[in-house]
Curated annotation (Swiss-Prot):
Pfam families: AMP-binding, AMP-dom_DIP2-like. The chain crosses the membrane at residues 199-219, 225-245. Its main location: membrane. One of its GO terms (molecular function) is ligase activity. Belongs to the ATP-dependent AMP-binding enzyme family. The lineage of its organism: Bacteria, Bacillati, Actinomycetota, Actinomycetes, Mycobacteriales. Catalyzes the activation of long-chain fatty acids as acyl-adenylates (acyl-AMP), which are then transferred to the multifunctional polyketide synthase (PKS) type III for further chain extension. Involved in the biosynthesis of sulfolipid 1 (SL-1). It catalyses: holo-[(hydroxy)phthioceranic acid synthase] + hexadecanoate + ATP = hexadecanoyl-[(hydroxy)phthioceranic acid synthase] + AMP + diphosphate; holo-[(hydroxy)phthioceranic acid synthase] + octadecanoate + ATP = octadecanoyl-[(hydroxy)phthioceranic acid synthase] + AMP + diphosphate; dodecanoate + ATP + H(+) = dodecanoyl-AMP + diphosphate; hexadecanoate + ATP + H(+) = hexadecanoyl-AMP + diphosphate. It comes from the Bacteria. One of its GO terms (cellular component) is membrane. Keywords: ATP-binding, Fatty acid metabolism, Ligase, Lipid metabolism, Membrane, Nucleotide-binding, Transmembrane, Transmembrane helix. It comes from Mycobacterium tuberculosis (strain ATCC 25618 / H37Rv). This is Long-chain-fatty-acid--AMP ligase FadD23. GO terms for biological process: Actinobacterium-type cell wall biogenesis; fatty acid biosynthetic process; sulfolipid biosynthetic process. Pathway: Lipid metabolism; fatty acid biosynthesis.
Length: 584
């Protein structure tokens, strides 16, 4: 029996479309207009086998191969070559400096790679990052672009059934103690079946023949890896790719690449929709028709309904269809995907009383009032339940609890972390409802609720702000702030004299134009909005320059680090109001 795996499905693509274009990478670093380089399926396969042959010289089946390379075709070939060799791939970012490199160091210590795959351009930066303490042998480092990648195939095909883990997807949480989620081919293929059923429900769960993937997401992030590298192989379609830097430099490039001939399927976090709506100008979009875009998935972080509306309103004149925007929920522990909005319909937004939410209950309110949340149909696969984490019993509709997930897409656990694996992946329900399995359940650590047979997400339980005894979602408070400032912000609770006080860190653009009057205006507007919408007073509003708020490698705010920086008075304030010791 032929096992289904990424390498075996790559072979199928070669058999069906040997000369078809597989991956096209647009390099905007060498030329601002973009230099395009493409590989056919045959070329991808040949290069993958040659990388695998080199990898097998240094490591055995089941060993770890870390990929530390810039975004590009070499990264894809390195990742696929590691899989083809039967190793466990560990995708990481190229060394960037700062907290990013701390994370790389921690992952290397945890994964203990037997070989490192990189490129010649950054070899000098990579070697110090993977050099172990004295007395421990360094893993060999291979520059894949220096191999004779297009030589006659010289690698044997590995029996995929021998592999229990395909790759380790390290989470973007703690920098110093990262956890590697063990993803199997069974997880990947199950998750793709779930995604295809949901995203193409309006076309009989069959992707259109002219579908292509467009992604600028980093390959070391779960959504970027699954969408940019795995999806083209599993779906059997081409991909047009570029880098996160290319997007950040000119967000309009994202729209331009999606408007190519064919039906684009893309994805991005919420901030990308906000940035594109604000920065893309009509001159960049002249002549573009966005009407053929099949799907733009919005996930990886809390989805703000107001951001999606701004995005659609901004680009509807270029024929962007509202139902092409698909809010989504997922996490690395479930491979990547759990739920999305209804196919063929605009995102459905419901409104709830903020004070009831802070008390643990979901009470609907009039449209346009209260807290706006995206509505998701409860998926049949995977199974989702809202659970009281203290009693392990299912919550009734309208009661906030922890989101638990059960399905073949849920990973087996964390690499060499049995205790954390049991806590996170070993959930068992007490007296489950009819048709609901006892376990095992993935405890996501996210809070949510069910209302009128729809599923709603609030945010990370560990990030909940407890102010004067009531729970408040930092995501909701940050959404309120961003409606005024349009920039990154962080809502944190800081202990002070036995209670926790709300502090907001707010990044403001156009530093040169930030006079006292504007700073005062922003302060008044933000504090008033938080008071009106959430019934909270802001103990301190910290105005800072862009880039001041620490984030993870996937762009999420590191709130615990924000608390630390605030308490140590390490934010450089634009309002020149340093924290006093007496304030704590």
């Amino acid at each position: 029996m032929v096992s289904l795996s990424i390498p075996s499905m790559l072979r199928q693509c070669v058999n069906l479309h040997p000369d078809g274009t597989a991956f096209t990478y647009i390099d905007y670093e060498r030329d601002s207009e973009g230099i395009s380089e493409s590989l056919t399926w045959s070329q991808v396969y040949r290069r993958t086998l040659n990388v695998a042959a080199e990898v097998r010289r240094h490591a055995a089946i089941g060993d770890r191969a870390v990929i530390l390379a810039p975004q590009g075709l070499d990264y894809i070939v390195a990742f696929l070559g590691a899989l083809q060799a039967g190793l466990i791939a560990v995708p990481l970012s190229a060394p960037l400096g700062g907290a990013s490199d701390e994370r790389v160091d921690a992952v290397v210590r945890d994964a203990k790679p037997n070989v490192v795959l990189t490129t010649s351009a950054i070899m000098g930066d990579v070697v110090p990052r993977v050099t172990p303490p004295p007395g421990i042998a360094s893993p060999p480092t291979v520059a894949v672009d220096q191999l004779d990648l297009d030589s006659p195939i010289r690698s044997n095909i590995v029996d995929d059934s021998l592999q229990t883990t395909a790759y380790l997807q390290y989470t973007s949480g703690s920098t110093r103690t990262p956890a590697g989620v063990m993803i199997t081919y069974k997880n990947i293929l199950a998750n793709f079946q779930q995604m295809i059923s949901a995203y193409f429900a309006d076309t009989g769960a069959v992707p259109p023949l002219d579908l292509f993937i467009m992604s600028w997401l980093p390959f070391y992030h779960d959504m970027g890896l699954v969408l940019g590298v795995c999806a083209p192989i599993i779906v059997g379609c081409g991909a047009v790719l570029t880098s996160p830097v290319a997007f950040l430099q000119r967000p309009a490039r994202w729209l331009q690449l999606m408007a190519r001939e064919g039906q684009a399927f893309s994805a991005a976090p919420n901030f990308a929709f906000e940035l594109t709506a604000a920065k893309a100008i009509d001159d960049d979009l002249a002549g573009l028709d966005l009407g053929r875009i099949k799907t733009i998935l919005c996930g990886s972080e809390r989805v703000h309904p107001a951001t999606l509306k701004r995005f659609v309103d901004r680009f509807s004149r270029f024929n962007l269809r509202e139902f092409a925007i698909r809010p989504a929920y997922g996490l690395a522990e479930a491979t990547v995907y759990v739920a999305t909005s209804q196919a063929g319909q605009p995102p459905e937004i419901r409104y709830f009383e903020p004070h009831e939410l802070s008390a643990g209950q979901a009470k609907p309110c009039a449209t346009g009032a209260g807290t706006a949340l995206v509505s998701y149909p409860l998926p049949q696969s995977p199974i989702v339940r809202i659970v009281d984490p203290n009693t392990n019993t299912e919550c009734p509709p309208g009661t906030i609890g922890e989101i638990w997930v059960h399905g073949d897409n849920v990973a087996g656990g964390y690499w060499e972390k049995p205790d954390e694996t049991e806590r996170t992946f070993g959930g068992a329900l007490v007296a489950p409802s009819a048709g609901t399995p006892v376990g095992p359940w993935l405890r996501t650590g996210d809070s949510g609720f069910v209302s009128e047979d729809k599923f709603f997400i609030i945010g990370r339980i560990k990030d909940l702000l407890i102010v004067y005894g009531r729970n408040h979602s930092p995501d909701d408070i940050e959404a309120t702030i961003q409606e005024i400032t349009r920039g990154r912000c962080a809502a944190i609770a800081v202990p002070s004299n036995g209670v926790e006080k709300l502090v907001a860190i707010v990044e403001l653009n156009n530093r040169g134009n930030l006079d006292t009057e504007r700073l005062s205006f922003v302060t008044r507007e933000v504090t008033s909005a938080i008071s009106t919408s959430h019934g909270l007073s802001v103990s301190d509003l910290v105005l800072v320059a862009p880039g001041s708020i620490p984030i993870t490698t996937s762009g999420k705010v590191r709130r615990a680090e924000c608390v630390k920086l605030y308490r140590h008075n390490e934010f450089t304030r634009l309002d020149a109001k340093p924290l006093q010791a007496s304030d704590l």
